[in-house]
Amino acid sequence: MGRFGRLQDVLRSERFRPIPFALVLAVAAAIGTRGGVDLAAPTPKAAIARALSAHGIDASAEGVELSTFVVSRRPRSLGSVEVALVRGRSPSDDMHDLYMTFVRRSPEGVVLEISAPVNLTSSASVDEGAPVVSGPFVAYTTALDGAPKAIHVLDLRGHPAAESADFTSLQKLQSAGTEWQKTGLSQGIVHDVYTLAGDFTEARLAFRGDALDVGLGGGTKVVLDPGSRRVLEGAELLRVSLAEKGRPAGLVPWAVDRVRSVPAFGDENMQILKAVAFTGLEWAEKARTKVTGGPTVTAETPSGLEGLSQVTGGTVTSTRDPEVGFPPAPLEPILKPALPNEGTFVALENDPFITPISGVPAPFAQTFLRADPNRTGTRIFITMWDARVIALHMEAGTVEPVSATGEAGPGTIARTPEVLRNVVAGFNGGFQAQHGEYGMQANGIMYLPPKPYGATVMELRDGSTAMGSWPGNSEVPDEILSYRQNLTMIVQDDKWNPWNRTWWGGTPPGWHDTIHTTRSGLCLTKEGYFGYFYGVDIATEELGRAMLRARCRYGMHLDMNAGHAGFEFYSMAQGTGFSPLGRPLQADWEYEGQVKDFPDFRFRARRMIRAMGHMNFPRYIRRDERDFFYLTARRVLPGPPLDPGAAAWRVKGLPQHGYPYAIATTTARVEGAGSAIAVLEVDPKAVDPKDGANDDPTTVLALADRRGDAGAPTSPGKTALVLADGRFSLVAREKAQGTPLFTGNDAPTPATRAVVGVRDEDGVLLYAEIARDEPKRADALAGAAALLGRAGASKHVFVANDVAALLGGGLALDGERDPVPHGPVTVRLVRRAMPGGRPYFESTPVVDVSVWRPLQMQRVRYFAKPKPAPSPSASANP
């Protein structure tokens, strides 16, 4: 191997990397400062306020509260150490923060010693109010433009041991070290946030016994119980965010964060240290190459597809269904000669580590590319997914991003069956807030406002995943539910780095960044697919080169460095568990366990590639300190079999007019029926209602009353089936908006030949039709209704008339031409675009560095969103 190769391996080794950081951390931990005390101050509170001025904090005695919570009690001659909470601000800032300091007083109550203050809030955009204290509990408000926005409650007793019961011993030690550095208390401080849901002019706090009363003016109030962390009164006025510990990072990333948090060292020095270390490794690699004449293939760079598919049983694709269009076409390798299967996608069919999606082609595919001619041993691995079938979501961590309003994220995927049963993957987010304060909003909660011209991925309210460069303002369109920003686009308009950025996170700002390290990225392809990119020992230019070769329309940089970047697949099972794998789990990249806080669910997890060295595997299915993305399977047709006795769903050869499928048909035998019944399901997200009088080439389903042997139509039913807001629903006919698709009753009429219901979970229409010559008509209709109930439709009605349900406007449910006469079409369901991947903010121009950089360098500040002006006809509304 040679001495350079051995040196590089030592420098890369896990046992070496923590050493310099641990040494610096030990020195930093020994540094302590004690503020001078004015013994002549008239009151202890005045003494504390004056002492903080030595630390550059403006405070008054009125903004100081002493907690009866005693941190430690020494012999009475030395006094006890108590906690003081202080509302203060920097002289150059008009916003207050909440500071905490430890105070030692004499037996007579004279302040003898004060520790250096700790800023508990550091919120850039809201003003913290004066604290109120009761025992270990501290409460205060935050305000924006003078209006209260949230109530914050602190518990100085810290986090209960149960929150970290599943941590390793090392993780518990790390967690205690982090809390000690942040607060001076190894158990930390519990910080719950109760955000006000309405507009109020005041929020007056007062502890009354064990409860916290919050007066909101006009007789309105909320009451909180800090001890049980419950809302006793006014829950409808609050959005509650209860703090819980997230799992700490791996040892090396954790040590780096702890050192950069030491004021005497700081982030800039850490960036310099990292840049020097990476440059040294790069030098060692070049020197080694000169000696050995060949590239290094590290343990984290598998030589080909085996790191992706040797266990999963993936299928190398050569053809694809033109109706579906996924997996993507193979990618042309960048370096020649190409390695076997380089650029060829592996479809992850029947993968035991991905939650199954019935009836559709595999929505995930993987490949790899080499992009650096000087490092031909490195790989950039790509996982691509079909955004029409897979939805992207994002969640804030319990620590990152550090919010400008003081609100922390939950750090977990929502613990509800509706979400968990559809989770298929998770992966890392972007940079920490201190490295640019790039915007983030999750599920409508804004943690950091958007930066102008920032590279942005979004979840829209219709479920689509979008990507684009934010425009030059910070307004968030109502259509956007969630967004995450990071830097500027690596790739846009078929160009690498069109924004001419020079800093990509590997060096101090202002240095030219060509650092080779572990990097990750996300892209939207020209076909509308999304891809996650991961490479070890790569620079941003190589990442961008791979994105361009993958036909990315937009490409953005995500988090970087070993331990921070990672992608995991998940398979979720509720209740019954999994089918056996038939082999032992491979612990270096596979895992099976129970979902914490939701024991009814079990999960299997697998890293995207076997050698992916990210921290805390499995990471994203647990509670995490940092923000992350997760993927869920959309509810698309055809889904699982209707009934054990039902035939397979049919989707091919039907008038779908697009993908995912709009309709599916099957047949089933039901008890009491002489013949099989025909069943149709319609996805409400795939169709729009339209007047039946006008033909439409994208007609999926047309409805008409029959004439002929059924005679004239009977009276309409009392219940109507309608399509609105992306769901079918059954409503009283007199309340139906627009033309009902069907009307029906609780009992069949002489003309009834069909039953309709709506699946509770997703609003899908289920329509069951008996044969025209069915000899046991009543029994068949009853059996059809029971079948819809087993399929998830808790409500159903018997269609009042003999209705013709015509696929494409003329076909019976078996796909053949309907021979029975019918009247004019009354309503059509025509194809509509479904949620998927799409570009956003396409009109944002690429501007010069001199325009975007000053805007992105500004510290975030929130501004009250202007209320919409009333419409001209508002005064006429009742």
Residues of each region from the PLM?
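Gly/Ser/Thr/Pro-rich low-complexity, intrinsically disordered segments
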Residues: 13-878
